[in-house]
């Protein structure tokens, strides 16, 4: 049994961390911090967790084997010094995911550049061995996870890709924002980031492929779909053969149906789970490939992947506390 602390537990991903860890057979949650809600019971912020006897605190004094930093981008680098050396750390912000040069290009100046190289990029499908030995893990971004897994099998045959992303309202976080209130968000298919999305940096770092994201807000609460286009010389069988590198991965499901409504990945069928569904289509006449990847941005794109990383870091079964099917209908 290990002890876990969550720094920044009031957001959507923080709430999912609490939910997943509270059901994990090898974890005791010792501390959940929130400045705004200090002293309040967890269910006052996350009503789905009614019955869980935990309260928020604003104190950083706690006993833990693993610390999850579920704070806004830019905050982790400011506070991480308080925790270094006291426990293993899994950071869910973007602060330590990419190199100093990429960070400065996509985000701006970094307050703790000397720590970046000490973090392992926490995508288990690519870095399982490194994660197992790591003390510090940077949890990947949700969009980046979907696109990296789509492109990685093709990194040696393509250098550029175009990515169409459909993302849910929860991806914007829990802070009040006029763009996310119901009258403004309902029924939209809204382009909000046509160029230079920050998660492109993670894709470039992990695959070597220059991916151009165009992100659309759509009228769903959770989940995302990445549609990734690139040139590919070969056949449909060659495409599938490359994707079969994921055979045996516990949280990747290849969608290869030839007909029906579910012949391509759809975020509707991964909601509430740590699965990524990956499918494809191929235009042999024009040598164009499309790889589709769907995931729940709060689980495999956030809290679930963090728990998966924790399992690996502590030598637990990788699927422990995560081995359940998606909600349906959702």
Swiss-Prot record:
Which GO MF terms are attached to this record? Answer: N-acetyl-gamma-aminoadipyl-phosphate reductase activity; N-acetyl-gamma-glutamyl-phosphate reductase activity; NAD binding; NADP+ binding
Q: Which SMART domains match?
A: Semialdhyde_dh (SM00859)
PROSITE patterns in the record: ARGC
Pathway, according to UniProt? Amino-acid biosynthesis; L-lysine biosynthesis via AAA pathway; L-lysine from L-alpha-aminoadipate (Thermus route): step 3/5; Amino-acid biosynthesis; L-arginine biosynthesis
Write out the catalysed reaction. [amino-group carrier protein]-C-terminal-N-(1-carboxy-5-oxopentan-1-yl)-L-glutamine + phosphate + NADP(+) = [amino-group carrier protein]-C-terminal-N-(1-carboxy-5-phosphooxy-5-oxopentan-1-yl)-L-glutamine + NADPH + H(+); [amino-group carrier protein]-C-terminal-gamma-(L-glutamyl-5-semialdehyde)-L-glutamate + phosphate + NADP(+) = [amino-group carrier protein]-C-terminal-gamma-(5-phospho-L-glutamyl)-L-glutamate + NADPH + H(+)
Tell me which SUPFAM superfamilies the record gives: Glyceraldehyde-3-phosphate dehydrogenase-like, C-terminal domain, NAD(P)-binding Rossmann-fold domains
Q: Which domain of life is it from?
A: Archaea
UniProt-annotated location(s) = Cytoplasm
Active-site residue list: 142
Which residues hold NADP(+)? 10-13, 34-36, 297
Q: Which UniProt keywords apply?
A: Amino-acid biosynthesis, Arginine biosynthesis, Cytoplasm, Lysine biosynthesis, NADP, Oxidoreductase
InterPro entries linked to this entry: AGPR_AS, AGPR_type-1, LysY, NAD(P)-bd_dom_sf, NAGSA_dehydrogenase, Semialdehyde_DH_NAD-bd
Q: Which family does it belong to?
A: Belongs to the NAGSA dehydrogenase family. Type 1 subfamily. LysY sub-subfamily.
For this protein, the record's PANTHER family field holds:
[LYSW]-L-2-AMINOADIPATE_[LYSW]-L-GLUTAMATE PHOSPHATE REDUCTASE-RELATED, N-ACETYL-GAMMA-GLUTAMYL-PHOSPHATE REDUCTASE, CHLOROPLASTIC-RELATED-RELATED
**What does this protein do, in the record's words?**
Involved in both the arginine and lysine biosynthetic pathways.
Q: Which HAMAP family match?
A: ArgC_type1, LysY
Under what name is this protein listed? Putative [LysW]-L-2-aminoadipate/[LysW]-L-glutamate phosphate reductase
Organism encoding this protein:
Pyrococcus abyssi (strain GE5 / Orsay)
């Amino acid at each position: 049994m290990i002890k876990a602390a969550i720094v920044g537990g009031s957001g959507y991903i923080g709430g999912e961390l609490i939910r997943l860890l509270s059901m994990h057979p090898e974890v005791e949650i010792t501390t959940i911090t929130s400045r705004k809600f200090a002293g309040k019971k967890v269910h006052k912020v996350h009503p789905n967790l009614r019955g869980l006897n935990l309260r928020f605190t604003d104190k950083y004094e706690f006993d833990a084997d693993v610390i999850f930093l579920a704070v806004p981008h830019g905050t982790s680098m400011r506070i991480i010094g308080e925790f270094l050396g006291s426990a293993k750390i899994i950071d869910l912000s973007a602060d330590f995911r990419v190199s100093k040069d990429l960070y400065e290009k996509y985000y701006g100046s970094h307050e703790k550049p000397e720590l970046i190289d000490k973090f392992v990029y926490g995508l288990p499908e690519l870095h399982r061995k490194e994660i197992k030995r790591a003390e510090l893990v940077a949890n990947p971004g949700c969009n980046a996870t979907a696109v990296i897994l789509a492109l990685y099998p093709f990194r040696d045959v393509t250098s550029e890709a175009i990515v169409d992303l459909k993302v849910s309202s929860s991806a914007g976080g829990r802070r009040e924002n006029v763009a996310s209130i119901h009258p403004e968000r309902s029924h939209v298919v809204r382009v909000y980031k046509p160029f230079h999305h920050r998660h492109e940096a993670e894709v470039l770092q992990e695959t070597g492929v220059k991916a151009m994201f165009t992100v659309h807000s759509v009228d769903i609460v959770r989940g995302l779909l990445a549609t990734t286009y690139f040139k590919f010389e070969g056949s449909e069988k060659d495409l599938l053969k490359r994707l079969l590198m994921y055979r045996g991965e516990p949280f990747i499901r290849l969608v290869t149906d030839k007909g029906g409504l579910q012949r391509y990945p759809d975020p509707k069928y991964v909601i509430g789970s740590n699965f990524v569904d990956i499918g494809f289509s191929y235009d042999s006449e024009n040598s164009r490939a499309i790889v589709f990847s769907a995931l729940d941005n709060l689980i495999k794109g956030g809290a679930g992947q963090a728990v998966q990383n924790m399992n690996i870091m502590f030598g637990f079964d990788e699927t422990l506390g995560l081995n359940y099917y998606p909600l349906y209908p959702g």
